[in-house]
From Swiss-Prot:
ATP binds at residues 134-195. Belongs to the GARS family. Binds 1 Mg(2+) or Mn(2+) ion per subunit. This is Phosphoribosylamine--glycine ligase. GO terms for molecular function: ATP binding; metal ion binding; phosphoribosylamine-glycine ligase activity. Its EC number is 6.3.4.13. GO terms for biological process: 'de novo' IMP biosynthetic process; purine nucleobase biosynthetic process.
Amino acid sequence: MKLLVVGSGGREHAIAKKLLASKGVDQVFVAPGNDGMTLDGLDLVNIVVSEHSRLIAFAKENEISWAFIGPDDALAAGIVDDFNSAGLRAFGPTKAAAELEWSKDFAKEIMVKYNVPTAAYGTFSDFEKAKAYIEEQGAPIVVKADGLALGKGVVVAETVEQAVEAAQEMLLDNKFGDSGARVVIEEFLDGEEFSLFAFANGDKFYIMPTAQDHKRAFDGDKGPNTGGMGAYAPVPHLPQSVVDTAVEMIVRPVLEGMVAEGRPYLGVLYVGLILTADGPKVIEFNSRFGDPETQIILPRLTSDFAQNIDDIMMGIEPYITWQKDGVTLGVVVASEGYPFDYEKGVPLPEKTDGDIITYYAGVKFSENSELLLSNGGRVYMLVTTEDSVKAGQDKIYTQLAQQDTTGLFYRNDIGSKAIRE
């Protein structure tokens, strides 16, 4: 069986590597992928994610069994619909189902309609009305661009002035273009955040281990929001009762609701949750695997990944098993200056040996193909599975201390919340 993974980051590296390790999978292509993936025997295809017709032609010419779609923008652009129309299978939601991610207002409407716990909110396209709402509600308050904004479209404002400025940047200054033409303004929720993922097909779903991401750039959750600087799974201090509540009050009603709306959901559903004094509430939905959470969840899968996905797509009950003990922890290494301006072309350390996994993201080979160089904001991620969060930290940070990370940076406290609890 030959498979195609669409995307180019660390998430797609983890997906493709796990698929290639599955029985019956002979070859995994990644479009466009990154040069670091070739070190794990993956084949790159020089087609960008927005070129649906070229991807479809490639899949047909190479007798691809099915495609796994990684990035949110491809799903929002209807790549799954296009593959299906061409008679090809793709694992991911249709454009209509993916609206759970590409419109925060739509997600809110679904949650309200199906009684899913989330923050109180208002949606605005008129700046003066947004400003009046902010002034009426007070701070802290959260301002979100309605559409996709590379994970940067959320401002947690500690003052009314900050919130008004964020709304102005989105609605009047076109900071995020069409994605910010509407804003969702939410009450601030206090509590610890965690991620819950599920494989889904219609109202059938299969929960994955819990994970905790670290969005801020710097230690102590300081600095600007990023795509994510590290993660670990499962979250050891999170009671199973909280997970069970989230499944029954959030995951199940949302997926059943999407079926009722005529938008049945196939793919990975990510639920960003916050554990408040009133129980778990939804911060956001993503219509695909998270990055970096994928890189610490998939190493815990002990069943056959390709078979699991194939079964889910076919409506067959999958046999999914997860490692029960230990913790998987990963730290992202990023270009200095990320998430703002950064240099490219920094030489990278050689791939680690042993049981530390390296997943590559923003990298490319030098002209003579002897060296990997940085080529993006988030560059690579080191992942290990150990008995505890502390053991995972020790292993990764010892390895990083031995690497030359000049021109790069990473957080030194990934997983520390689990140790403090």
